[in-house]
Amino acid sequence: MSPRTNESAPEGEPDEVTTAAPQPPHDASAPEPEPVAKPVAEDKAELPVAEDPSSEPEDHPPVADERVAAVRRVSASSRRWRAAQLGLCAASLAVALTAGAMIFGALRDGSGTAVAATPGAVSPQLLASGDLDASITALQAHLRTQPKDFDSWATLGLAYVEQARTKGDPSRYPQAQQALDRSLKLRPGNESALTGRAALAAARHDFTGALTYADKVLKENPYSERALSSRIDALVELGRYADASKAADLADSRRPGVPVFTRYAYVHELRGDVKTARRVLEQALGTATSRGDVSYVATALGQLAWNQGDYASALKYYARALAADDSYLPALEGRARAQAAQGDQAAAIKGMEQVVERYPLPQPLVELGELYEARGHAGDAQKAHDQYSLVTAWVSLAHSYGVNADLDTALAAADHGNRGDALKAARAEWARRHTVHTADALAWALHVNGRDKEALPYARQATATGYHNASFLYHRGMIERATGHEKEARASLKSALDLNAGFSPLGAREARKALGEAK
């Protein structure tokens, strides 16, 4: 699943389950907990606020075609600079959500439960309707007539964060911050806006800030599902895995349901406990009722299956997700990835092209570029280069709207661009947070810069938790090989291919080549 960081995410988050909550995953025999009828929170911020809720920031690209065109314009205007950076390793997850890295997005959690509202307020349920643009339009119209409705301002801020995340449109983040600021100005310290501030901080990869705001909410409302979920995400993305595990247990005891179950599962996956992760996700899927919940959890199961090299199961889960929501981006990406791993190159390229046409986000752009490289038809090298260039353009746009994209830059430049830039970005990200993903990125950046002795401890740290990730094992194996640890290198490379033989169109090929040379 991915943080979110990449966080995620990812990539939309599930709506809150409104029926009786299912059993906690840590004790399948326990009686079903009663649903907690606590109001769920939305968003907060700190900037000057536009009085008109529909006002667009300067140069904001609200329509998909315009957004893609904007990315391409930035790309065209910075060809010389972008040629030095390029690409993104196919193993990365935009998490992250959210990411968090596993975060397909910690943004739709609990949106099926209304916050305490002023008369005539627009419920956050509106965001679960399936048409985010229509929801935003309705909120804007409502706020023109009820400009002092602090809850609806918070809900609008949350909607902008969700729109930025799902459409690859970072220019929405300043609007989200303005809406959340407006909510806080009208009602200082309100839970909805504080929780939204946690979501916005996470979306911008400010995980320390996300944790701070989540803790503020939980101090006043220990049962806030959104804040409990955001706290787990932030701890995971900060590499505080023991604390994240405790936070997941606490959240499960207080607010068992789909948002908490998915995070509980990911914490176990990071520790190598795939069996528990799968069981919890299957339980969550069995209790899911909304289309958003079904697509989110089924996609998480698909990603888990793909990570273990079980492509048939992955495709089954992605089909389940797309049956619930045929436009769900993470499921479309995942399906193309699984098709590529199974050898259905044509379907994989077609699917990833469709994803990129709609949402030019870093991971699908790079994966499409690597699929072109692996195919090797006439013109494919240029097509691949174009995708990598768009990644660099997107990173530039993200930085301009306050999003920390150093992890994306490190992975991108290491595989397809300027290696010095890769190392600089990886070091910057490592200085902020120590996670398995940042350890892997720093190890690989050091490796491509010929600093393998320095790289090896980080490569080993990336695999130390037991997390089953073939790309991490591949990176470790190549670094071990470069440092003369031939026996360990063969074991790591073999483990990568045994785990997930199609983990990357290019990386898997290099792993097989290195193993052949080592014989």
Over which residues does each language-model region extend?
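Residue-level recognition of tetratricopeptide repeat
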Residues: 158, 162-165, 199, 233, ...
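Canonical tetratricopeptide repeat
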Residues: 155, 196, 230, 263-264, ...
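TPR alpha-solenoid repeat register
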Residues: 152, 193, 227, 260-261, ...
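Residue-level detector of the short coil/turn that links helix A to helix B
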Residues: 164, 171, 205, 239, ...
